[in-house]
Amino acid sequence: MGNESGEWIMHGMNWDNPDCIHSVDEAIKYINEFGFLPLFKNDIDGFSLEERTVPEYWWSDNPEIDPWMWRAIIARRHDIVYGKFFDKKAGFISKKWLPVFANYRRDGYDFDALYDDGKAPNKHKKIMVNFMENNADSEIYSNELKKQAGFGKDGEKGFDGAITNLMMQTYLCNCDFKKRVNKRGIEYGWDVAVYSSIEHIYGYDYVTSCYKDNPQDSWKQLVDYMRKMYPEARDKQIRKILK
């Protein structure tokens, strides 16, 4: 998705193109086969879900053909993780590749150790305590998490930025998108992001299974794979999207 002369333009392909992704199941298959994929177009041509779908079907509110709705379905199924993983923008990581990303992005640190070593700010700690120890399997609405973590008018600032940073470090993901529920148990409003730890999706042992490797070796594995799959991509472009 690009802004051209003040107008947002979607980039994609025709329905009858043999490379076109037509359904959420096809999207899941493609992501699992490739391993990871940004949601929207970026500096590497072809490396996004957007560019492999029909532009006119985005935000059509038809789950059969709307890629914007697919992202919520994929997040909800807990087979592939979804979040802001690519240059602080949204995308998907398969179960196969998640440990490699986690080892590199976390530099081999669990969050509590990262914080204890002075490498994470207190505002991140206030968010993460809601997903650690007895809260390890929590799934929390964005608006509720903001309150629980002490963000708001008279509290911490920069909630959205903190969430994005924790996703980039692969500590959190979007595990669902749901409508809020009022006191009478009735859903209302727009769908709201629901967050969880990535360990909640895949389990601690699996997520940390590459901790035994040097984080720079995991980085090299990611870069070498991208060079193989997108040989035309420049190193600068690869670093930008994967750092």
Walk through the language-model features, giving the residues of each.
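Long, low-complexity intrinsically disordered regions
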Residues: 1-243
